[in-house]
C-alpha cells in the first residue's frame, strides 16, 4: 500500500473510526490507513515512488458515532453534490436500512453547518474528525 500512496500522492485521505463495536474490520482499516501514510512519508522507507507529503486525514462519520468515539470537527457542505451522494448511497442495496438515517443526518449536519458558518445556502453537510492538527498561518 505504501507504493500505492506514493504513486497516487493523495491530497486528502478518508478513513474509518478508531473504534467500532459492530464492524471490527473498520478500526483495522483505520490503523492500516494511518500506518501506511506514515511509512509513505518516511524518507528511509524502502518502497518505490516519491515520498508522500502530509495529506490531511479525516475520519468520516459512522452510523453509530456515540459508540465509535466520533467527534465532529469539520462540517463539509455537500449541498452541490447531495443528489449524486444519494444515488450512490441507493446503489448499495445491502444498506437500504440506513438510507433514511443518512438522509436525515445530512440535513441535521447541514443545519449545524449553517449555525456554525452563517452560510444560509447550506442544506446538506457531512461531519468529519481530524486525525492530525490543522496547520495554518492565520485563523479562519
What are these regions (language model features)?
Residues 1-140:
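Metal-dependent de-N-acetylase/amidase catalytic core
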Amino acid at each position: 500500500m505504501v507504493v500505492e500512496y506514493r504513486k497516487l500522492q493523495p491530497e486528502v485521505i478518508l478513513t474509518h473510526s478508531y473504534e467500532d463495536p459492530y464492524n471490527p474490520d473498520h478500526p483495522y482499516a483505520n490503523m492500516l490507513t494511518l500506518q501506511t501514510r506514515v511509512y509513505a512519508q518516511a524518507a528511509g522507507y524502502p518502497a518505490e515512488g516519491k515520498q508522500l507529503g502530509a495529506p490531511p486525514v479525516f475520519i468520516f462519520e459512522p452510523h453509530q458515532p456515540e459508540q465509535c468515539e466520533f467527534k465532529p470537527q469539520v462540517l463539509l457542505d455537500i449541498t452541490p453534490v447531495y443528489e449524486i451522494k444519494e444515488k450512490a448511497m441507493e446503489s448499495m442495496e445491502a444498506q437500504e436500512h440506513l438510507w433514511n438515517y443518512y438522509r436525515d443526518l445530512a440535513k441535521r449536519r447541514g443545519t449545524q453547518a449553517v449555525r456554525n458558518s452563517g452560510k444560509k445556502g447550506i442544506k446538506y453537510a457531512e461531519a468529519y474528525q481530524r486525525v492530525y492538527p490543522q496547520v495554518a498561518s492565520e485563523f479562519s
